[in-house]
Structure formats: structure tokens, C-alpha cells
């Protein structure tokens, strides 16, 4: 078994694709980790904005969470319809491009790509940050831990969709079991205590502030905007419909409903218990900081084994939340590449039937972010949710146009559902933009514009290439004369002999060029007449010319390139074939033992850009 087989698994045939498809159980960790993990930081993000209100701020977490839950429900029903209408994968890019046009589609694609890169970097950083706060000795190794987790997630995803689902299933279900258990036990205690439960471990008291009778609309809008980070990753299932086994649409819809249902239960339960237990957020930048979930689990269950298992599962899930981006980003890139807005290589599936290039590129870009910020990406959090809500809005608006065009039974009802989704997410997008603009949302806008410009440039290049190589006339064989053949060699041997034999089958006009070096030139000239000219003449052929090129500065490639350019000018009506003899080693570690002149020569000739030059490799395989 090769090293690659051990690292990535044995290659899968296209016929194995059905076996790699997944059901709901595997779909939850693959496509739902990002959304579900947001229960660990979404409510806290909203509560952090309410810290200045003291105890009064805790009262507002329930209505703020209720607004987010209503929005989640609307988006859920909207995306169920998108999955049914686009069973081949109906992400925001596909829907917006098909129904609103090319540019809105690119906006949706760029917004989602940037959001996915942020999800990976910030998710891993948040998980490692929580681990470091629990084990301070690990603080110097923050960046190494981040990059290590990133590498593991990348490798698991390169092994295939099904295997990724199996690997991430256990930590996902442990996270859900412990957090749902906390919500259930806490709710029962609250109900039996008539809404005033006694905490096992009392949370720190809220910030003492002057009497506040009500929160300003601006503070509540900011809290809502921060809490909307809980909705990132909701779209992933609609992009990955083809990953599900038959019945594809039903399995994808069921998975989406389970993910959204679980997230709603978690958000509602956390908000309810936070208010019941009087838990306020603490300032992350000050000593004594505790996460909201840490205080909540302590209040409900104390600081025993259950607390540590729950907090441990949260740390793991925060780190692994990046997996949703690894499942969706490559599929999005493939869809964009199919329309020539990204390199076509993004559309090719690798040895394990996954889009390898998309996975690797996402890991590299996220790794760069982690390197730049030293593994601490708190400053990137304000950029969150902008891309997601922009994509949500364009997708839902596209579905409205879709139902308007398709019509038929149920079209009006579907149009109303998607229209409501478009309005709700559009309003939320404006709120998030206004609330977060000063703290970094403008950076997202610039990045989206830059990425769209890059994609348009790629499309322009492909259009130019397509226009240049396209042909409508049939094959013409008129005026096809024998080419001028040039064979560069450095000494006489089996490699040179094989190249020369092939050259003589193409044309009688063969020139062998040799760059002068004192020892090799003398030896070659002595052998040329006996080893080449005499045998060719005896066979009735025209002996090839041996042309020795001077090189006073000991350059090898430049004299050959100059000679080729000169031959091109002297033979304006002829094709020129350059036969490049090359040694091919059996093992990769032998290549550094040889010079790489053949490869460099080919590169230089190709860069020369003459359309009449044809390069031909004649390999000699080393058997030893």
C-alpha cells in the first residue's frame, strides 16, 4: 500500500459514487456543524452587546433570540423549496445566476466564498482559543494548534464525503446530547421552581449600572446583528443536495429540517435559561471572563464530570465547525468553474470523488488568515454574516423570479414563502451592514468586489481563448510539407540515438545542435561521422547536420534558443519540430542527480510563443 493510499485512502472509481452518498445521520455533521456550533457563540455575541445595560440587558435576550428564530424558520422553509426546485444543487450562486442574471450570481458566489474562508479561520481559532483559556500553558502554541487542526480537517475531507461524516459524527452527537441535556434539565428545574431556579454554581452578578428603564433601538439592533452569526452555514445543505442518497431531495430536506430544528431548540433553550438564571455576558477582554455556556452549564449541573464533558464537546465542535465550509466551498467553486469564472481544475474530482482543489485552496486561504492573525481572529468576527445574508437574499429573490417564470400548481404559495424570505433576509442584511459597518463590514464589501473582479477576469480570459481556438472549417491537409527538425544533444549515447531515429522518420531536413564545451565537443565530432553519417548514407538517406553552437560564457540553453529563433526567421513557411531527448528516472529521488535542462529548454521555447514550433519529447526510461 502506497503512502497516498494510507493518507487519503484508496482511489474510488466513478461507479463507487452511490456508495459514497450519505443519509441524514451523516449529513448533520457534514453540512450542519457550522450552523449547530453557532449556538455556542450566537447568544453570547448578542448578550455581549447588552453588557452596558446590566441586569436589564438579560431581559432582552429572549425577544432578540425570538426574532432570530423567526428568521431561521422563514429561511428554513425557503430553502426547502430551493432544494425541491434545484435537486442538482441549488445554492445561492446557481439560483441567482439562473433567475437574476450573471452579476447577481457572482455577488452571491463571492459573498459565500469569503464567508466560508472566515468560517474556517474563525471557527478553528475560537475552538483553540477556548482550549487555551482552559489550559493556559498551551497559549504559546496557539498558532500551531490552529494549523494542526486545519490540516486534520483538510485531510479528513480529502478522504471523501462519507468518511468525513463518519469521523465527525461522534463529536457532533456528543455536543448535541450534552447541550440538549443541559437545556432539558435546566427547563425542568425552571418550571418546577416557578421560573426562578436556584443555580448549582451561581453565575457572576451582572454589571452594576445606573438605573436603566429601557434599551435603545440602536443597542437592540446591534445585539440582533451580532446574534445573527447563529445563521451562518444554513445554506450548506442546498449546495450539497447531490451528496445525499436516494431519495435525494427528501433526504436533503429532512437533513435541513433536523439541523434548523435542533438549532432553534438550542437557541430558544439557551435564551430562556439565561434569563431564568440571570446570566449576563462577561467582557472577553478582561480577567475573570467566562463564556455564557460555561456559566449556564455550571448553573444547571454544577462543575462535575458533566460540565467538563459538555465544555470539552463545545471546544471540539467550535474547532470542527470549519467542516461545513470544507463540504460546501469546493461544490460552490465547482459550480462557478463550470461557467468559466474560476479555473476549470476546480471542477475535477480527485481520487476520493471530492473536489480536491477546492478543499486545498480553502485550507491554504484559511491558513494564511490564521498566520496573519497569529491564530487569534477576533477582529474578523465583525465580517461574519454579511456574506451569508447577502447570499440568502439573492437566493430568495432568485426563487421568487423562478416561481414567477415556472407558474403552475403551488407556484403562488411558493412565491409568497420565498418572497417573505427575501424581504426578511434583505432587511436583516441592512441591519447587519449598518450595525457592523464601522467595525469592519466595509472590508467584506471590498473583498466581495475584488473577488468578483477576479472571476470576471478569469471568464474574460477563457472567452478570449475559446474565441481564438474555435474553428468552423474542416481539416485541411493542403501544403503540409515535411518540417525542419532540430534535435539538441549534449553527447552521443542511447538517449540521443533514439531521438535522432525518431527525427529521421519525420523529415530529411534534420539538424542536430550541440552547445560547445571543450571535452564533449571533441568526443562528439570524432564519433559523428562513424556513428551517424556513415550508417545514414549507407541506408540511402540524407545525413543530419551537426551544428556546434559557441558559448563563450558557458551558457547552454540560451544558444539553443537563439538558434531556434534564427531558424524560425530563415524558414518562414516551414513547421519547426524540436525533438527533446530526456532521461526518465524510475524513482523521484533520482531526479536531483541530473540537470533539468530538458524541462527548462521546453519552458523557454514555449514562452517564446511561436505558433509554428512543435515540441516533441523522446523519453529514455532508466530501468536500473
Describe the predicted segments one by one.
Residues 186-197, 256-294:
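Extracellular/periplasmic helix-exit of transmembrane alpha-helices
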Residues 173, 178-230, 435, 439, ...:
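Helix-loop-helix junctions that connect adjacent transmembrane segments
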Residues 47-88, 92-97, 103-108, 122-149, ...:
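Extracellular loop-to-transmembrane helix junctions
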Residues 1-14, 464-473, 478-624:
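Cytosolic C-terminal regulatory domains/tails of membrane transporters and channels
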Residues 1-45, 77, 88, 96-97, ...:
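Membrane-interface "cap" regions at the ends of multi-pass membrane proteins
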Residues 102, 140-147, 243-265, 337-371, ...:
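Loop-to-transmembrane helix boundary motifs in multi-pass membrane proteins
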Residues 28, 345-356, 392-437, 468, ...:
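C-terminal membrane-solvent junction of multi-pass transporters and transport-like membrane proteins
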Residues 153, 158-192, 255-259, 381-393, ...:
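Membrane-interface loop-to-helix entry segments
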